[in-house]
Amino acid sequence: MAPKVRAAKKGEKRVGKAKSGTAETAKRRRGKRKESYAIYIYKVLKQVHPDTGISSKAMGIMNSFVNDIFERIAVESSRLSLYNKKATISSREIQTAIRLLLPGELAKHAVSEGTKAVTKYTSSK
């Protein structure tokens, strides 16, 4: 026969399993994280002008600018891969998209910096 279990009276300590979820409810839930290029923009700023700061409003504008350029390059390179009936966007499509999107000297510098970055990445593997 099973032993009898009596209910705890008011004021008595309860012995047994702790309530599940108490540790989870004690922790505060974080909101969804916002992805941003802010830390990278700041690192580049410090490389170029170590003594210069940036306001949060200016950082927001720079972040929007980077997102916009990134999207334009992605759309243009996607369009180029469709024209060439290719399923994959390669560095060639990215390079051509940059040449089409950016004017003159800026495009040349962007292509050379991009090539340098890709070479550095592939050699480090």
Swiss-Prot record:
UniProt cross-references to CDD domains, sorted A to Z: HFD_H2B (cd22910)
SUPFAM superfamilies per the UniProt record, alphabetical: Histone-fold (SSF47113)
Gene Ontology molecular-function annotations: DNA binding; protein heterodimerization activity; structural constituent of chromatin
Entry comment on modification after translation: Monoubiquitination of Lys-120 gives a specific tag for epigenetic transcriptional activation and is also prerequisite for histone H3 'Lys-4' and 'Lys-79' methylation. GlcNAcylation at Ser-112 promotes monoubiquitination of Lys-120. It fluctuates in response to extracellular glucose, and associates with transcribed genes.
Subcellular location: Nucleus; Chromosome
Positions of transmembrane segments: none
Protein origin, superkingdom: Eukaryota
Annotated segments matching region Disordered: 1-32
Primary localisation category: nucleus
CC per GO annotation: nucleosome; nucleus
Disulfide bond positions: none
Pfam families associated with the record: Histone
Cross-link Glycyl lysine isopeptide (Lys-Gly) (interchain with G-Cter in ubiquitin), where in sequence: K120
Record keywords, A-Z: Chromosome, DNA-binding, Glycoprotein, Isopeptide bond, Nucleosome core, Nucleus, Ubl conjugation
Glycosylation sites: S112
PANTHER family associated with the record: HISTONE H2B
Task performed by this protein: Core component of nucleosome. Nucleosomes wrap and compact DNA into chromatin, limiting DNA accessibility to the cellular machineries which require DNA as a template. Histones thereby play a central role in transcription regulation, DNA repair, DNA replication and chromosomal stability. DNA accessibility is regulated via a complex set of post-translational modifications of histones, also called histone code, and nucleosome remodeling.
Protein family per UniProt: Belongs to the histone H2B family.
SUBUNIT field: The nucleosome is a histone octamer containing two molecules each of H2A, H2B, H3 and H4 assembled in one H3-H4 heterotetramer and two H2A-H2B heterodimers. The octamer wraps approximately 147 bp of DNA.
Protein name from the UniProt record: Histone H2B
